[in-house]
């Protein structure tokens, strides 16, 4: 897939950050779905497994500078998973849940990354993107990753 993603970008002379998406069937055969010519919400997963800051690289390209690495330098290591934290009420058809963050305890530790602007006292408005945080966890292998991933829902406070 990596090789085909690179070929797709080269075929259209694409030189910025982007995501090539594939779908994989139960037999492991993959099919091209689309290419998004932007940084996506899930970019943190890629950053965790490659050690590359994609936002910095995108800024470098916009400034006319070359990437600070070559494709040959990119070697994925381990596995990562992203959990999105949304201010919604699942039992009410995922209705928005505005309000004030009274207590905030974010997961932390080796291989844990939290992307958020939340803080104690933050007022979540009623007109907002419901995703208020992302918890990304990286581990050497998938089993270790799933075993050590924090459970944000268990830690949530209102």
Indicate where each model-derived feature is located.
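ATP-dependent carboxylate activation and anion-phosphoryl transfer catalytic cores
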Residues: 1-149, 153
